[in-house]
């Protein structure tokens, strides 16, 4: 079963079967990423634009690579170097791109709901590459794929997410996705960065002591402290955060012996994670980056109607 939609705006409203379809397709895409000749004609004639209103290295680059590996015409566009800087509004920008024949827009925006606004006003496909605090669905999908690769299944796993939960669109998408797949999601962070009421209603368990959340975990995911989104009163200091919530090898021992360590990046070394732990065999952070290209290839394939055209390779 393919995706029953033309756009990917979030995982909250995505069916479990759709997530499974994407994860299954990603296995084939990863084989393509890892081989010497990566170029395919699958999306020849398909045009996509990466429209980013916020800085990005991993997400934008991986979408660009994903499109190029499948043969799509891919263009990167930053808000600061476009008519947006002259005051053009979002819908007008989208309509301009659509008038040029663009088939798909990948968009990152600081305001929650911006991708949905665009999707409601355009006929081309939209992929949400992160909107405010709301969602970052492709990051959660690549996280789930990475976990599934190592653990075989997501069902019944205890997944602990630690850090700046309040400002994290990655955490929100992971909660929606992982709980749909049957995982037990635990959250840990300072009280100022973890609203128990909101996240409990989403299906996660909340802890203020990181040690309690780490106990017997199958997967540990650290999140970046988003200093650009915070007021100065939310954390006493980064040193204090590292002391209470930073993950080091001693704390990591509270998780299961075969526990995995994930981080969406970029990492503030010595704050969220120690370099020693990040460089250990527990870490699958580099694998997440590889899988990010593969998961985005799978999404482009599905949203372009690629499954109607036969085999990938």
Curated annotation (Swiss-Prot):
Its EC number is 2.1.3.2. Signal peptide: none annotated. Pfam families: OTCace, OTCace_N. Carbamoyl phosphate binds at residues 58-59, 108, 136, 139, 265-266. The keyword Transferase applies. L-aspartate binds at residues 86, 169, 224. Catalyzes the condensation of carbamoyl phosphate and aspartate to form carbamoyl aspartate and inorganic phosphate, the committed step in the de novo pyrimidine nucleotide biosynthesis pathway. This is Aspartate carbamoyltransferase catalytic subunit. The gene is pyrB.
């Amino acid at each position: 079963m393919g995706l029953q939609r033309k756009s990917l705006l979030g995982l909250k409203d995505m069916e479990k079967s759709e997530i499974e379809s994407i994860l299954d397709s990603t296995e084939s895409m990863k084989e393509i990423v890892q081989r010497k000749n990566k170029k395919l004609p699958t999306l020849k004639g398909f045009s996509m634009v990466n429209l980013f209103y916020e800085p990005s290295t991993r997400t934008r680059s991986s979408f660009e690579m994903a499109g190029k590996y499948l043969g799509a015409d891919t263009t990167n566009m930053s808000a600061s170097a476009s008519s947006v800087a002259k005051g053009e509004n979002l819908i007008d920008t989208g309509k301009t791109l659509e008038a040029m024949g663009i088939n798909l827009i990948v968009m990152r925006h600081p305001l929650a709901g911006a991708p949905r606004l665009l999707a409601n006003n355009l006929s081309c496909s939209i992929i949400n590459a992160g909107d405010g605090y709301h969602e970052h669905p492709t990051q959660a999908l690549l996280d789930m794929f990475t976990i599934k690769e190592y653990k075989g299944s997501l069902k019944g796993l205890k997944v602990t997410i630690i850090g700046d939960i309040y400002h994290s669109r990655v955490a929100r998408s992971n909660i929606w996705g992982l709980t749909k797949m049957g995982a037990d999601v635990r959250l840990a962070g300072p009280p100022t960065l973890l609203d128990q009421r909101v996240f409990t209603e989403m299906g996660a368990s909340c802890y203020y002591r990181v040690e309690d959340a780490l106990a017997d975990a199958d997967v540990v995911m650290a999140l970046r402290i988003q200093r650009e989104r915070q007021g100065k009163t939310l954390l006493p200091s980064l040193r204090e955060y590292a002391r209470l919530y930073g993950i080091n090898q001693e704390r990591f021992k509270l998780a299961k012996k075969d526990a995995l360590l994930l981080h969406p990046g970029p990492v503030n070394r010595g704050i969220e994670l120690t370099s020693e732990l990040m460089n250990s065999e527990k870490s699958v952070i580099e694998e997440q980056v590889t899988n990010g290209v593969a998961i985005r290839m799978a999404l482009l394939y599905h949203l372009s109607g690629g499954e109607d055209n036969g085999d990938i390779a």
